[in-house]
Amino acid sequence: MAMLPLFEPKGRVLLVDGHHLAYRTFFALKGLTTSRGEPVQAVYGFAKSLLKALKEDGDVVVVVFDAKAPSFRHEAYEAYKAGRAPTPEDFPRQLALIKELVDLLGLVRLEVPGFEADDVLATLAKRAEKEGYEVRILTADRDLYQLLSERIAILHPEGYLITPAWLYEKYGLRPEQWVDYRALAGDPSDNIPGVKGIGEKTAQRLIREWGSLENLFQHLDQVKPSLREKLQAGMEALALSRKLSQVHTDLPLEVDFGRRRTPNLEGLRAFLERLEFGSLLHEFGLLEGPKAAEEAPWPPPEGAFLGFSFSRPEPMWAELLALAGAWEGRLHRAQDPLRGLRDLKGVRGILAKDLAVLALREGLDLFPEDDPMLLAYLLDPSNTTPEGVARRYGGEWTEDAGERALLAERLFQTLKERLKGEERLLWLYEEVEKPLSRVLARMEATGVRLDVAYLQALSLEVEAEVRQLEEEVFRLAGHPFNLNSRDQLERVLFDELGLPAIGKTEKTGKRSTSAAVLEALREAHPIVDRILQYRELTKLKNTYIDPLPALVHPKTGRLHTRFNQTATATGRLSSSDPNLQNIPVRTPLGQRIRRAFVAEEGWVLVVLDYSQIELRVLAHLSGDENLIRVFQEGRDIHTQTASWMFGVSPEGVDPLMRRAAKTINFGVLYGMSAHRLSGELSIPYEEAVAFIERYFQSYPKVRAWIEGTLEEGRRRGYVETLFGRRRYVPDLNARVKSVREAAERMAFNMPVQGTAADLMKLAMVRLFPRLQELGARMLLQVHDELVLEAPKDRAERVAALAKEVMEGVWPLQVPLEVEVGLGEDWLSAKE
């Protein structure tokens, strides 16, 4: 095989601070995993940064890592780097992969016991400089600024070059002054003490003024007394700090800068394929790029993949800027994109639903068909964006409509190949996700009517309530203050009123005023309840009441939310622009906001709500006979659970018992701990432990199912719904207890929540054509609710049909139950 083009000689040595770069990219790209749930963000980020540097500076390349053994600095100063957070659990495994990548690229890799990477880099840089090379050091570590010279520069990972001129412009210092400056100022990240009371600004000024530490101490009598005292008191720390800051340039290393190594191209290809770095396969030159497409006239043949670009993301509001179609190596571009839509019979492409919504807006009956995003999402629900999918499976998401069309065609073929043999995932694609995208397109284009006048009146009412709450808060505080200022609120609550500080913020360490903290303090002082009410009212006013009228489309007079099909880890739909999921269902103001969603004149809203669907799904998945029997016999699940837990007859269950049982019934689905339960029910911790134990005694197969689900998840790396939808949960095997427990809660909740989502989606797909026959519309899907709109004279028929379809969507061991309501608005339909 030919040598990679990125290794062409440049007369320059590139030194890479491997450990530093790996750690930096680990945090910069948090959340990037393979389809198996394997975290790879550090590997990907490292490879991208390295590749960019190799293309520009890659004649001789040496990658340096810190050795595991402590360095001489740890021996000189035990507290060196002592303040650093523990190494993240995922990092060592990714670091091993990075080293494997370096070896496959044929690059020199060095680790020297007893010395840090800085010392190795410094030695190599000075030696290469002496041999006549130009040197670039890829790092963001400021310790190495002391090495800068005419022939040594630092290449920052963000792409800019740090030279002696840059250093002088930014700090007013020369490279040979850097160690003295660091010795004075110290470095908290490495726990280098510096001189107490002297910060970076003062240290810069002193070194600029006196040139060096040596000269400064020779003229100490000319320094103002307060500074002189600090310097004299800190002489020992200063000497230590200078020793720790100085890098070694004389390590006994053997590196031949003239020797070149050949990369292992087959191994590199296998490595990148294993980690699903499709875009890097192209960038490293290991895959032939797509052949230049032959330009062809519009329109493309039926079945072509489309690419398009909008002026803004929301299809109901966007202008169609460009439209293209790709098919079998030919690229067709529409000269007039909007007119070009009229030549199409369907939409295949990335984000196909969005283009279909825009077409429906223009009066064209175009519906989405195949979408590679849906295939990618089924392979791994972390595949939520075109950029991420292109990066993982090969390609680049650009602004060009033609490139997007070609990418869609390639990705569809790649992803279909990956799904070969995955019959359950393919079934979900063909029977659920693909037809659902057609339903959602029509729902988005239809929208829902909004009573704007009502919202404007509600805004005035809520504004008056907010002002009244403000006055009450100020009266209780004894003076006015800015209720929206976290710092002012902190002072009022904890300093002036003396309330206990329960927690601190992660970033600043200040006393927390979060909702959770205030909830815990609600009984401590009447001001807390008023503040919580104030926050709820202002949040809903600013998020919904005031913005919603502006979102009504001038052409349709309706509100058009966007339904996101590839956004959640469980398979549930989400909505945005606006997000209707976040309107509270049970609070008075949340209900008043729902009142603004109204039916068209002569129509009514039909609202259908799956009753306790997740508990019914749990009964089916666990096979627990007691749980199944309760639902089969139509008994109240919370009353029956309380009866078994407390050892009383169902008639003897009081409201407190039922509340406890209800909290546990739903809490179990989300892994509620005894500590959380004790807080929810205001009972002792020991009693909460006993409650949970009695719950599992009442439903023994639920515990067995949870344990079995976790065991299977640990073995396979993922959990799945009744229909085979997957969620990868690699942290089930984490060593850190809190990380592992969080993964466990996700793992046994997902099959329940995801199955409920699958049932809702399947019901929508089956109900949609039946509604069209009756002239009814599907408007919204929020949580477990489906909101329809029907002509008044057909509303009862529509309601009966929808209930029948939703309850009979799939045979389970327990009946699905749907509550139905009709009304002129969303609120009255639920009452």
Swiss-Prot record:
SMART domains (UniProt xref): 53EXOc, HhH2, POLAc
Classification via CDD domains: DNA_pol_A_pol_I_C, H3TH_53EXO, PIN_53EXO
Transmembrane segments: none
Segments forming domain 5'-3' exonuclease: 174-258
InterPro entries: 5-3_exonucl_a-hlix_arch_N, 5-3_exonuclease, 5-3_exonuclease_C_sf, DNA-dir_DNA_pol_A_CS, DNA-dir_DNA_pol_A_palm_dom, DNA/RNA_pol_sf, DNA_polI_H3TH, DNA_polymerase_1
Recorded catalytic activity of this chain's protein: DNA(n) + a 2'-deoxyribonucleoside 5'-triphosphate = DNA(n+1) + diphosphate
Domain of life: Bacteria
The keyword Electron transport appears for this protein: no
GO BP: any one term: double-strand break repair
This protein's UniProt keywords: DNA damage, DNA repair, DNA replication, DNA-binding, DNA-directed DNA polymerase, Exonuclease, Hydrolase, Nuclease, Nucleotidyltransferase, Transferase
NCBIfam families documented for this protein: pola
Similarity field: Belongs to the DNA polymerase type-A family.
Protein name: DNA polymerase I, thermostable
Source lineage: Bacteria, Thermotogati, Deinococcota, Deinococci, Thermales
Gene: polA
